Amino acid sequence: MKKKYRVIILQILILIFIISINGNFLIGVFWITLHELSHIVIASSYGCKFNNFKINVLGAKAEICEIEELSEKRKLNVYLAGPCFNFIIAMMMYILNYKYNLVIFENSVKINLSLGLFNLLPAYPLDGSRICEILR
């Protein structure tokens, strides 16, 4: 069996496993997509072009053209946009949960805090690795 097909089958099996364990999978995909969109919005405001968006069970990636041509400060802003988005949304969801006490808000707080912190880890291909490269 070709490697390409094995990877697809593995991703489908992982996806089935995740969905069967946690009903919050779609909420997570929603917040991951908006996390990547925040990178695109900030990069676009600096004149970069959006090339492609890829999502699979291992993560998501927004491909942005001309990002290497940006100043270090602007690149830092682009890379920080995703985690900052997640932390802001987590605070908003916390306030909504405090007021309305709905499970979806509580789960969104947990998901966004996790996404924000996870993406700040200094491990490639996460945002944290790119942030560390700039701050060195």
Regions found by a protein language model. Give the residues of each.
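Hydrophobic transmembrane alpha-helices and their immediate loop junctions
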Residues: M1-R136
